[in-house]
């Protein structure tokens, strides 16, 4: 089936921000003005189109990345609305991996907030061009210029104003477009009637100053424009737009617009900016991968006549269609009902149906082309991060990396009937979410589920009950500790069994040594002269890995360790993979015990926003929680306190903060790093254990 929309007229964008900056409201307005919905849904009354999960509607937050398609000025815009809560950072990460551009929404009162920093860095990692939208210009304390400054200082980025606001707070009525030098105001509540007015006299100086900065930036993007500018010639609107687009696509500058989505002001110019300044799939570099046949790097260009390649970025279980896989087509075309090759798993898959998504509504289509973001039913083996390709031209695109979970809870089914259902349900939820992990404790028979934060696990448990009808008892949250070593040790593992007939023989000598924090695990084979035959080396590594899943102090996973196999011996008849695996496991346990093992705990980056009257009390409380204050900042009568605090000390903090600040303080926290548990705390834990 032929392509309906040319690639140059396609935009794949994300909407990203801190929680409560107004992303979902902005998306709702975009859907309204592009004619995708005929009434505006509000987040606060649970009617937002893009927040379609029950949990999202109840909490007024976005949890999953909902995808939708809309049209503006004969352009097709595929939008992914991403969550702002730190527990769902993985949703942002996997969306940014498949997008070409993004709208970064900031609260014009608060400026850059902690999660906006995280999301901005994620977008930097994938070099995603962005336009900035300063939302909530109608709120008390909204400050366009101060917010721009905070983008510059906190993010180290270069924002460039393409609009400035007409008024602020309750006097915010419209904008001045610096590209066209025109002022306009909104004359109706729905924001559909826009009237041009003369630029107010008191703003002519500000307009001249910021337009000059814009023209200077535009001139720097192109030699011809620079000559024109230096000769004092007028740059046309077209010249200016070309310059802004060039700087945006190069991820050097970030055009800044403003508005109030809730008051229906500023969304149409934002859509114009998406079309004018953000990239089409043809503007971004070819996607890189590894050719499976040759092992060499290969590239795929966004063209329909290239071999098919796509990246699965999300898997979800839909109550009506079953397993639904979202993927981005990077090159080529795929038809409904056709076979594709999962190059990551090296398996053939059949696409049952292709679906164009609109939040949770779907429209069946016959084919997907390069640049499309699409849902597919029928892919049995594909999981998040897998590459789909043409079997004749297999390629593996760079997969996504996800953070390790930091918090766990024990979960038990209430009845025997719930037991089987719970296993299936947890497995399905783990398929959807790469940061959600399940572990069974053989000794206690308990199931441990782990995630990125309390809210993350709360949502999982809620979904178990509502979607899968599983009744379960939930334990108290537990911290995902790890163990590591501080010293170097050598140990020997010898496994010999003789029970008549063929025996078992495995013998290894290994050395363990610490790695830098966050480096994980490394295995090094230093065998010379075949004292341990090559065919047994993988079994040794497997034994080592299995032994490190349970440390010698408390049974927590051992991290940041290098294990080297340095010596050993074998028996020509009795040696086997099993014997070497067991010998390696025995050696590692001994070596770790002799290498000064220590306990590691997750440290969270905490930001508390509160009135200055309560600062002393809150700081002393954070100190009592083993917190380390890293920064304090003043914003009017508000103080921002930043600290690194162990997760173990943060349970119940929200309630404590509310009572200490009479409900006027709030906090956000996100995982930062692992650090050694102080000896006195570790000793207490050992006595309890």
Swiss-Prot record:
An example of a Gene Ontology cellular component annotation for this protein is:
cytoplasm
Q: Which SMART domains match?
A: EFG_C, EFG_IV
Give the domain of life: Bacteria
Keywords on this record?
Answer: Cytoplasm, Elongation factor, GTP-binding, Nucleotide-binding, Protein biosynthesis
Localization: Cytoplasm
MF term (GO), any? translation elongation factor activity
Q: Which residues form the tr-type G domain?
A: 8-282
Biological process per Gene Ontology, one example term: ribosome disassembly
The main location class comes to cytoplasm
Annotated GTP binding sites: 17-24, 81-85, 135-138
Q: Which family is this sequence assigned to?
A: Belongs to the TRAFAC class translation factor GTPase superfamily. Classic translation factor GTPase family. EF-G/EF-2 subfamily.
What this protein is called in its record is: Elongation factor G
């Amino acid at each position: 089936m032929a392509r309906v929309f040319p690639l140059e007229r396609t935009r794949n964008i994300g909407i990203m921000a801190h929680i409560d900056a107004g992303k979902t409201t902005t998306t709702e307005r975009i859907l309204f003005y592009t004619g995708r919905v005929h009434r505006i849904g509000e987040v606060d009354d649970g009617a937002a189109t893009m927040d379609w999960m029950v949990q999202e509607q109840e909490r007024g937050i976005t949890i999953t990345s909902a995808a939708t398609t809309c049209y503006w000025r004969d352009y097709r815009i595929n939008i992914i609305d991403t969550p702002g809560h730190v527990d769902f950072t993985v949703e942002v990460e996997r969306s940014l991996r498949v997008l070409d551009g993004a709208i970064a929404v900031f609260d014009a009162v608060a400026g850059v907030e902690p999660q906006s920093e995280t999301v901005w860095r994620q977008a930097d990692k994938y070099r995603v061009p962005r336009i900035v939208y300063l939302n909530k210009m109608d709120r008390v304390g909204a400050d366009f210029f101060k917010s721009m400054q905070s983008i510059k200082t906190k993010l180290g980025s270069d924002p460039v104003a393409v609009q400035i606001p007409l008024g602020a707070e309750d006097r915010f009525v419209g904008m001045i477009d610096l590209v066209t030098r025109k002022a306009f105001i909104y004359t109706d509540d729905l924001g559909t009637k826009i009237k041009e007015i003369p630029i107010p006299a008191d703003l002519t100086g500000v307009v001249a100053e910021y337009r000059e900065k814009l023209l200077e930036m535009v001139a720097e993007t192109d030699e011809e424009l620079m000559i024109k500018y230096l000769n004092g010639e007028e740059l046309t609107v077209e010249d200016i737009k070309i310059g802004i687009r060039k700087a945006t696509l190069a991820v050097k500058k970030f055009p800044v617009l403003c508005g109030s989505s809730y008051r229906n002001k500023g969304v149409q110019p934002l859509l114009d900016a998406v079309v004018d300044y953000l990239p089409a799939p043809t503007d971004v570099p070819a996607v890189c991968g590894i050719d499976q046949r040759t092992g060499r790097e290969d590239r795929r260009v966004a063209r329909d006549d290239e071999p098919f390649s796509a990246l699965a970025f999300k898997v979800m279980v839909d109550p009506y269609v079953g397993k639904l896989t979202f993927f981005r087509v990077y090159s080529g075309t795929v038809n409904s009902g056709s076979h594709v090759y999962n190059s990551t798993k090296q398996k053939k898959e059949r696409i049952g149906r292709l679906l164009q998504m609109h939040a949770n509504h779907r429209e069946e289509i016959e084919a997907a082309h390069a640049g499309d973001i699409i849902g597919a039913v029928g892919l049995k083996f594909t999981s998040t991060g897998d590459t789909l390709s043409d079997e004749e031209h297999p390629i593996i695109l760079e997969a996504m990396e996800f953070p390790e979970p930091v918090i766990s809870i024990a979960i038990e089914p209430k009845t025997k009937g719930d037991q089987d259902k719970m296993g299936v349900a947890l497995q399905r939820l783990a398929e959807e979410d790469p940061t959600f992990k399940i572990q069974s404790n053989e000794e206690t028979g308990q199931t441990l589920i782990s995630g990125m934060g309390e809210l993350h696990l709360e949502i999982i448990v809620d979904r178990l009950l509502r979607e899968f009808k599983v009744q379960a008892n939930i334990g108290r949250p537990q911290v995902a500790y790890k163990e590591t070593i501080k010293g170097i040790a050598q140990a020997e593992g010898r496994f010999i069994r003789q029970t008549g007939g063929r025996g078992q023989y495995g013998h290894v000598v290994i050395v363990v040594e610490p790695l830098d924090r966050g480096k994980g695990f490394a295995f090094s084979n230093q065998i010379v002269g075949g004292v341990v035959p090559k065919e047994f080396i993988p079994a040794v590594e497997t034994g080592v890995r299995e032994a490190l899943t349970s440390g010698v102090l408390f049974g927590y996973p051992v991290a940041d360790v290098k294990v080297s196999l340095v010596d050993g011996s074998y028996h020509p008849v009795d040696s086997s993979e099993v014997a070497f695996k067991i010998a390696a496991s025995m050696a590692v346990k001994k070596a770790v015990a002799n290498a000064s093992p220590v306990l590691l705990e997750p440290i969270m980056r905490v930001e508390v926003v509160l009135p200055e009257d309560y600062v002393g009390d809150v700081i002393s409380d954070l100190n009592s929680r083993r917190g380390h204050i890293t920064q304090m900042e003043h914003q009017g009568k508000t103080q921002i306190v930043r600290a690194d605090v162990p997760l173990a000390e943060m349970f119940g903090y929200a309630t404590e903060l509310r009572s200490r600040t009479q409900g006027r303080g709030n906090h956000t926290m996100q995982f930062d790093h692992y650090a050694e548990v102080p000896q006195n705390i570790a000793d207490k834990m050992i006595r309890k254990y």
